[in-house]
């Protein structure tokens, strides 16, 4: 008997996820003007691994939604669009090196490792700022963002939030973790 791909949803779960994504898409048309749901759904149905990743985004509180369409590659771009940093992805340090450097009081995991396991990428600063043009996010929380290697080599990592109606980018030690800091993911389909 062939081994079943563990990154594939049951038909019931797939239909439930597609329904949630469709409803969110229809409710937030300002995020994706000129994009048609039927084309996205057809691509999703043909991409079991992408659906699995979107389900990971959904079940961890990310509320993924379409935020763009790359006409060159014909890929639809999903970001986590939850009002606050996804609840089930908080209290994480930045990456594996930061996690391994902690001697005690280690967090359960790192943002980079969790994102990789989910099959998504952490938003860059540019992507985070694009997201903030679509609404007001992270008013009470903050989100790790992809950190340039020169900053990371020196032990730092970057995160963003929105306060005083302004998007801020900050630095912190990569090994730090907070109950109000998570990460937002990006997936291309």
Predicted regions located by residue number:
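A binding-site-centric feature that preferentially detects glycan-recognition modules on secreted/surface proteins
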Residues: 2-121, 125-189
């Amino acid at each position: 008997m062939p081994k079943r791909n563990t990154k594939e949803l049951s038909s019931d779960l797939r239909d439930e996820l597609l329904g949630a994504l469709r409803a969110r898409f229809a409710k937030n048309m300002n995020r994706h003007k000129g994009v048609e749901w039927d084309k996205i759904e057809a691509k999703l149905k043909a991409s079991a691994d992408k659906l699995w990743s979107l389900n990971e985004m959904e079940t961890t509180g990310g509320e993924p939604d379409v935020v763009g369409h790359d006409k060159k590659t014909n890929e639809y771009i999903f970001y986590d669009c939850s009002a606050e940093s996804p609840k089930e992805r908080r209290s994480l340090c930045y990456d594996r090196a930061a996690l391994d450097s902690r001697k005690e009081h280690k967090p359960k995991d790192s943002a980079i490792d969790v994102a990789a396991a989910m099959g998504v990428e952490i938003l860059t600063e540019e992507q985070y700022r694009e997201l903030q043009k679509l609404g007001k996010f992270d008013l009470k929380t903050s989100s790790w963002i992809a950190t340039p290697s020169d900053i990371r080599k020196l032990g730092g990592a970057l995160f963003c939030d929105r306060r005083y109606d302004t998007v801020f980018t900050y630095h912190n030690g990569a090994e730090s973790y907070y109950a109000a800091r998570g990460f937002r993911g990006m997936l291309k389909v």
